[in-house]
């Protein structure tokens, strides 16, 4: 039986996610995008276990509107309209939650009933249809319905600067039109997602690393920085949480430190791109989500890198992202090579045997988990409030369940404060206690351990770093 936890939902609307502190991204969500392995393969539970064992804290998935809504829903904003087919998405989100992993949902693809019988890349005839779909998805995974986990992160469309995913890119006279069209999609998607879950975080863009900015033989493409500026010109005043970018090396045998001609955007282009991003949207420090990145390997990709090179490039790529304080997310595409796939960038081969990159990825990702977060507070702050992620608790506890905790604060190795208490488990699978009896001194760093438990779940330990500014 579905039910709505209305009071708790209202209490969680103002909840904020713990933001990494410092001059670098000391914490960021690191994980994989691999729908074939995580959603459809017969070994998907094992694949998800391996993702978690590799210290993934986030898993991206594409929710294809054409597959979820092959026919027009009678009540499109109702997340449980009989026309919707969410079966494998529901299973994936539940399986991720059981493993303590966050989910990023990317909405993409227009059903033929919504665009006059055209392909999924074509714009919907009515943007209200996309807005209604976005609302239904965000509502279904808002945490308000028992058995349907809370999803924190959403992005709108996929590689929208490529005609492979969004058409048209140019009009008949050769003028670039895709940024203005995408801005319409983004505004409709944001409105829908926020109507379904006001605390959701939303990324826009989802741009590929390169494009040509003019019609030519082959697929029409627009360079990501050109595309971004066009989107910004058509989205004045619209709020969003991050720009999502796929800074793949190109050609595929290039290393993470590759330099490319701007307005193409790879990892080394970020300083210039971020300056333009702020100027275009008239904001400061717009966050970046890297929602796809990878290095394909030989022999599956003849033009790819060796497995040894892939292993060497992973810490370089994540290291470049980590040095950038704006980067909040790094998603590797894919976890495992699979039969029939065009991509050979997995850290596992098709037979599930690990490539040399596998232990390197696990080691590199481990210290970056936001679950063991880092925050900066003003010196002199008493009893600072912290956010404790307890995603796995939502698998066996309803929102509002009492979470007991013991908090210990250390200055170097010295125990300086101990407190105990209880707090309700939020719809977003966090608790937000205060670190009682602690006064944060300026220029001091504290290690705060939180031991938490509920009546039905095992004890877990989280470690939060608090820096006095």
What kind of region is each of these model predictions?
Residues 415-429:
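Solvent-exposed serine/threonine-rich low-complexity stretches and specific carbohydrate-binding patches
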Residues 15-23:
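C-terminal segment of classical bacterial N-terminal signal peptides
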Residues 41-44, 131-152, 173-308:
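Noncatalytic carbohydrate-binding groove/subsite architecture in carbohydrate-active enzymes
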Residues 54-217, 250, 298:
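Substrate-binding cleft and catalytic face of glycoside hydrolase catalytic domains
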Residues 24-57, 62:
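Boundary/entry segment of secreted carbohydrate-active catalytic domains
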Residues 451-455:
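Beta-strand-rich extracellular modules
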Residues 143-144, 160, 165, 298-316, ...:
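Aromatic-rich peripheral "rim/lid" segments of glycoside hydrolase catalytic domains that contact
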Residues 459-466:
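Edge beta-strands of extracellular beta-sandwich domains
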């Amino acid at each position: 039986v579905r039910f709505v936890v209305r009071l708790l939902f209202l209490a969680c609307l103002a909840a904020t996610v713990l933001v990494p502190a410092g001059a670098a991204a000391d914490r960021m969500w690191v994980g994989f995008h691999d729908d074939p392995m995580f959603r459809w393969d017969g070994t998907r539970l094992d694949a998800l276990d391996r993702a978690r064992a590799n210290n993934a804290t986030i898993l991206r998935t594409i929710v294809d509107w054409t597959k979820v809504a092959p026919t027009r829903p009678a009540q499109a904003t109702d997340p449980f309209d009989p026309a919707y087919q969410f079966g494998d998405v529901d299973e994936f989100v539940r399986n991720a939650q059981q493993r303590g992993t966050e989910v990023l949902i990317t909405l993409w693809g227009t059903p033929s009933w919504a665009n006059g019988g055209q392909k999924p890349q074509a714009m919907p005839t009515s943007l209200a249809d996309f807005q209604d779909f976005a609302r239904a998805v965000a509502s279904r995974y808002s945490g308000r319905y028992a058995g349907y986990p809370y999803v924190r992160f959403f992005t709108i469309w996929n590689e929208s600067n490529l005609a492979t995913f969004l058409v048209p890119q140019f009009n008949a006279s050769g003028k670039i039109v895709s940024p203005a069209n995408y801005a319409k999609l983004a505004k409709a998607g944001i409105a829908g997602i926020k109507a379904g879950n006001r605390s959701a975080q939303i990324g826009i863009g989802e741009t590929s690393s390169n494009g040509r900015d003019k019609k030519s033989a082959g697929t029409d493409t627009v360079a990501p920085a050109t595309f971004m500026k066009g989107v910004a010109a058509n989205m004045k005043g619209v709020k969003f949480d991050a720009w999502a970018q796929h800074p793949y090396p190109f050609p595929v045998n290039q290393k993470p430190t590759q330099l490319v001609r701007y307005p193409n955007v790879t990892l080394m282009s970020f300083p210039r791109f971020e300056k333009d991003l702020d100027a275009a949207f008239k904001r400061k420090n717009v966050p970046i989500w890297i929602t796809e990145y990878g290095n394909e390997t030989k022999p599956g990709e003849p033009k790819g890198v060796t497995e040894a090179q892939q292993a060497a490039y992973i810490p370089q790529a994540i290291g470049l992202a980590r040095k950038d304080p704006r980067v909040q997310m790094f998603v590797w595409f894919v976890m495992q090579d699979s039969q029939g796939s065009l991509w050979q960038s997995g850290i596992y081969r098709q037979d599930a045997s690990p490539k040399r990159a596998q232990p390197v990825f696990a080691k590199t990702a481990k210290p970056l988990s936001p679950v063991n977060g880092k925050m900066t507070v003003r010196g002199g702050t008493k009893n600072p409030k912290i956010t404790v992620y307890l995603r796995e608790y939502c698998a066996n506890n309803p929102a509002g369940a009492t979470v007991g905790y013991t908090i210990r604060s250390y200055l170097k190795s010295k125990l300086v404060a101990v407190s105990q208490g209880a707090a309700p488990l939020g719809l977003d699978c966090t608790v937000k206690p205060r670190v009682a009896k602690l006064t944060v001194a300026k220029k001091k760093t504290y290690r705060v351990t939180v031991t938490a438990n509920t009546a039905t779940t095992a004890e877990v330990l989280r470690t939060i770093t608090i820096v006095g500014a």
